């Protein structure tokens, strides 16, 4: 479930509470929930899947890998914003393996493995807070990328899983930003620590941390104003927010999550570079993948930044914000295994 929150589970209040909170044991209710999740993920990624997958599915359906098909696959991957480097390594794998493999299903398995490996980050161990201190996530990104919505959805999922959460209304810049977060707080039933628009973002977030510590709240999700790297005053504000959080607890923030709009394509790469340079981003959320055929950006971005994708947004509902799992993501893009033999299908 929330791999990110592993080891952060609340002690079960009673044995009956244990099953929904435990994300390591494969209990029966969890297994049922997972069965429903793959079709949901596939539906959310439908646009990307149709753009990047036709050539690949023809190959897996038994069509021989000739130059024409290779070109089609290359074009589809690039159109889905998979990026030149990631696309080339996918094509290299195909050229190499399609010769050796006896069945289309073998080619598929090898490509599947290659794609999954591409999504595995160069990750270092995330820090943990000292006992009695909240786990802190600072959420950053450009305007409208989905920061506040992602926080709301995460709060809902965490709350449902038995965690205690507080939200920090660190977007003190945009009018109505505080209200938007407060609405989420009310909806989910978690406290929102806020001051009025125009106040100091770092001070609001500091208040939220103090509130969480004094009440034994486990997790603080801190919203920030959307900003571009060119707005140097706002980028400096983010650095200050980080310094203030670190003064509260030197291990914090335990995650600095950069929220990227999946539809922004190659721009997302630029944002990852710029925010990474300014505030030491430790994880990514890619939102709005349901509305775009450019979901190949996930490969490009992990390849380039080495950062882990923590969550993806594939729809408007809270359950459409999903912890990112490379296997499930790749399976949703590639579709079902047909098991056909290489070259046995008609070329039409
Ligand atoms: N379809 C879809 N819409 C999303 C997703 N995530 C966010 N949105 C929508 O994107 C819009 C912007 O989301 P916000 O959460 O307000 O974005 P923000 O980054 O906080 O924006 P600023 O605070 O202005 O910087 C809202 O209409 C959300 O409903 C997603 O995964 N899928
Ligand atoms: Mg916002």
Where do the protein language model's features map onto the residues?
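Non-catalytic terminal/linker segments enriched in charged/polar, low-complexity residues
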Residues: 1-118, 122-125, 132-133, 138, ...
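P-loop/Walker A NTP-binding module and the surrounding RecA-like catalytic core of P-loop NTPases
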Residues: 85, 113-348
């Amino acid at each position: 479930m929330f791999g990110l929150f592993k080891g952060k589970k609340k002690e079960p209040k009673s044995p009956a509470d244990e099953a929904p909170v435990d994300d390591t044991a494969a209990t029966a209710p969890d297994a049922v929930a997972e069965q429903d999740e793959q079709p949901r993920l596939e539906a959310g990624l439908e646009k990307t899947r149709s753009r990047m997958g036709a050539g690949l599915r023809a190959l897996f359906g038994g069509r021989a890998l000739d130059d024409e098909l290779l070109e089609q696959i290359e074009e589809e991957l690039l159109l889905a914003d998979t990026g030149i480097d990631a696309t080339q390594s996918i094509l290299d794998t195909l050229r190499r393996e399609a010769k050796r493999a006896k069945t289309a299903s073998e080619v598929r398995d090898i490509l599947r493995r290659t794609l999954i490996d591409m999504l595995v980050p160069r990750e270092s161990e995330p820090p943990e807070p000292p006992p009695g201190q909240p786990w802190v996530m600072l959420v950053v990104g450009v305007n409208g990328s989905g920061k506040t919505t992602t926080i709301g959805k995460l709060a809902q999922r965490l709350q449902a899983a038995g965690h205690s959460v507080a939200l920090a209304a660190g977007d003190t810049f945009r009018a109505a930003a505080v209200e938007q977060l407060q609405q989420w707080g009310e909806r989910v039933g978690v406290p929102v620590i806020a001051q009025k628009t125009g106040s100091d973002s770092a001070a609001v977030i500091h208040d939220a941390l103090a509130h969480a510590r004094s009440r034994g709240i486990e997790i603080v999700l801190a919203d920030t104003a959307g900003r571009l790297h060119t707005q140097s005053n706002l980028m400096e504000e983010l650095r200050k927010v980080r310094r203030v959080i670190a003064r509260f607890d030197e291990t914090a923030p335990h995650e600095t999550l950069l929220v990227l709009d999946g539809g922004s394509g190659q721009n997302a790469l630029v944002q990852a570079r710029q925010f990474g340079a300014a505030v030491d981003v430790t994880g990514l959320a890619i939102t709005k993948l349901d509305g775009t055929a450019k979901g190949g950006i996930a490969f490009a971005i992990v390849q380039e930044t080495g950062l882990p994708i923590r969550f993806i947004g594939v729809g408007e509902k809270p359950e459409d914000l999903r912890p990112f799992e490379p296997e499930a993501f790749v399976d949703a893009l590639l579709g079902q295994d047909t098991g056909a033999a290489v070259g046995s299908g008609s070329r039409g």
